[in-house]
Amino acid sequence: MKKKLAFLTVLMFGLSLGLMACVTTSVKPTTANLKNPVIPLESMEVPQYDGYWYYSKGTKTVKGDPGDRGAFLPMSFLFSVQNPNPYPVLLEGIMFTVSFDEDFDVVTINNQDSYWIPAGKTTHVRTTTMITVRSALLSLLVTGGFKLKAKGWTSWDTLERWWKGVPDLTVPVKVKEGAFNFIASDIERVVAFEAQVK
């Protein structure tokens, strides 16, 4: 009986060492073996819609201060970040620009949240931003005026079309100049990104 107990103890100890050796021989991140994560844009939605409206500072208000104010247009982008590596990677920041009608940049998003993506897994990352009629108007007048003129569009007609068309995806929305910053151990990599909302 003592021989069996000693044999089982030695066998269990040997199996434990063997299994621990398998666990600790994982692949370490190197510049050569770090594969770029894959980043498809899953969806874009307008989580709250209050229509299209604008009033100037000359408008008499019932409550509150008069001013140049317009409707809000929140936009929420859902990305699937797929990690093809045999080790976890850290998504340390996201930056991208949102444009309407291909040519008109309306906002640049800079999200500094951190997300761990496990080895061989996919993590969903949501980034939300918001523009107003006023901010979009200023962008159109300052940086998009010549483009508007070339297309024969007016700023107010364009804004109304955007506010009514972006929520139901009848206005082209593009995510461009994207940069996703990944870290694996002490290796840092920026992955470029661009996508058309469908």
Protein language model regions, located:
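Sec-dependent bacterial lipoprotein signal peptides
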Residues: 1-22
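Short, solvent-exposed loop/turn segments enriched in Ser/Thr/Gly
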Residues: 71-77, 170, 174
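Short acidic, flexible loop segments centered on an aromatic residue
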Residues: 82, 86-105
